[in-house]
Amino acid sequence: MKPVLTAACCIVLSSLPAFAKDKAAEAKAMSDQQFVDFAAQTDMVEANLGQLAGSAASSQPVKDYGQMLAADHTKDYNQLYDVAHQANLNMPNAIDAEHNKAMIDPFQKLKGAAFDRHYAQEMVAGHTKAIAIYKKEAADAQNAALKSYAAQALPVLEKHLEDAKGLEKAK
């Protein structure tokens, strides 16, 4: 039994580096332009969904959270616009078809408690991903202003994540 247990432990331990690489790949290195594209799309989607929460959500906490996200991500988009412009990077000004189909369209069909549940889940997942990417950009951006922008945006994203987790637990 001991040799079997030892072998099993060796197999599990030898797979941990691969698992760590997979997690690290989620926040893979991006060019500054790719980060601007990601951040702008994220801001526009979050602001749009936040506004939608005002009419489609059933609980007041979800509506309030959506209103906060709409305001915060609109402000963040404007800050990103200024930084991108100074860095001579292109700034998307509309949600692209891919993000519309993946993020906006599914919510158009939901109302009430179903909207609330799906919104909370997506906000936890989305903010978890965004935080990893922003941390990477805050450390590795080529442009100093973009690096600073990413670092300054992190506390707001982290608050959004914690609030979304609270909404998810309440459902």
Locate each region found by the language model.
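His/Met- and acidic-residue-enriched segments that coordinate or traffic transition-metal cofactors
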Residues: 2-6, 12-171
